[in-house]
A protein has these predicted regions:
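Phosphate- and other anionic-substrate recognition elements at nucleic-acid/protein interfaces
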Residues: 2-4, 11-12, 17-134
Length: 134
């Protein structure tokens, strides 16, 4: 069964999450250096069926794209070029890093790992999308 991939794009690192086959739960998968993300996704999709990419989109409280959106826009063009047959949807990523950080603290993580925050953020983005589509 095809799965959904959640993506939290950043200038240095990209968090990636995956849905379960029934698209009920999102799980953190990997944190990838930004320069390697398209190749990582090509490798992943060659071994796993992906139905859709759910990409976190940075917006301000006034619902306008944040400064970071320009980087996500460039990535979106690369993603659509590399995977023309895989749909891409955008999901509001406001507060996902804060929620991911709190989630890791609550789970007992002592030393904060930024890579862990990124992939947990990707899972939160993906879970939010799936919950909204139920």
């Amino acid at each position: 069964m095809k799965r959904l991939l959640g993506i939290d794009y950043g200038k240095k690192r990209v968090g990636v999450a995956v849905s379960d086959p029934l698209k009920i739960f999102a799980s953190p998968l990997e944190t990838v250096p930004t320069a390697n993300i398209v190749n990582y996704l090509k490798n992943y999709t060659s071994e796993n069926e992906v139905e859709m990419f759910v990409v976190g989109y940075p917006v301000n409280m006034d619902n306008k794209p944040s400064e970071a959106a320009q980087y996500v826009d460039i990535f979106l063009k690369q993603l659509k070029k590399a995977f023309p047959s895989v749909p891409v949807v955008l999901e509001d990523e406001r507060f996902t890093s804060v929620l991911a950080f709190q989630s890791l603290i609550d789970s007992g993580v002592k030393k904060m790992d930024k890579a862990a925050v990124d992939k947990v953020s990707a899972a939160l983005i993906l879970q939010t999308y799936m919950d909204r589509k139920k």
